[in-house]
C-alpha cells in the first residue's frame, strides 16, 4: 500500500527530514528506509506503475497507483538482502520504461542497510528510476 499526499505535504516532510538529519534524529515515520519505494508523480494525471522485481532468478510483480501531483512512500518493498533488478512501466503506456538495480544488505544486528528505489513520473508521463543509499 502506498501512502499518498500532496506536493505541499511532500515539501513539508522533506523539510522535516532535512532538519531531522541535521539533528541526527531518524524517528520520523515517513523517513525512507533501506529497501523502500518512493514514487513522485509530477504529471497532471494519475498513473498506475507496474514493477517487475527480479532476484535470484525469481520475479514478482507489484502494482502501485499514484494520484496526479502526489507522492507515496512504501517501506519494506525489498525485505531480504540481495541484488534486485527492477523494471518499472506505466501500466497505461507501452513506451515508458525505466530499469535499475537495488542493493540491500543485512547488518550485523539483523536489520537492513543499502539502497531504496525512487521512481519519478515527469510531466507527460516520462519515467525515471534511481536508487539512493540510506543507512
Task: Put a short name on every predicted segment.
Residues 25-36, 116-118, 123-135:
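Extracellular ectodomain segments of secreted/surface proteins
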Residues 82-87, 96-99, 133-135:
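A general structural signal for short secondary-structure boundary/capping elements
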Residues 78-80:
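Surface-exposed, short loops/turns at beta-strand junctions within beta-sandwich domains
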Residues 91-125:
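Structured interaction patches on ligand/partner-binding surfaces of diverse proteins
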Residues 62-66, 74-76, 98-108:
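Generic detection of short hydrophobic beta-strand segments and adjacent strand-loop junctions
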Residues 1-60, 64, 72, 82-92:
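Hydrophobic alpha-helical segments
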Amino acid at each position: 500500500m502506498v501512502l499518498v499526499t500532496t506536493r505541499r505535504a511532500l515539501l513539508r516532510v522533506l523539510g522535516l527530514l532535512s532538519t531531522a538529519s541535521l539533528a541526527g534524529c531518524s524517528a520520523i515515520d515517513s523517513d525512507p528506509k533501506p529497501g523502500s519505494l518512493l514514487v513522485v508523480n509530477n504529471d497532471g494525471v494519475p498513473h498506475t506503475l507496474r514493477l517487475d522485481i527480479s532476484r535470484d532468478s525469481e520475479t514478482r510483480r507489484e502494482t502501485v497507483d499514484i494520484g496526479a501531483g502526489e507522492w507515496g512512500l512504501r517501506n519494506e518493498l525489498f525485505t531480504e538482502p540481495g541484488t534486485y533488478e527492477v523494471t518499472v512501466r506505466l501500466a497505461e503506456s507501452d513506451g515508458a520504461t525505466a530499469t535499475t538495480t537495488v542493493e540491500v544488505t543485512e547488518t550485523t544486528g539483523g536489520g537492513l542497510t543499502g539502497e531504496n528505489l525512487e521512481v519519478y513520473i515527469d510531466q507527460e508521463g516520462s519515467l525515471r528510476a534511481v536508487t539512493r543509499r540510506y543507512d
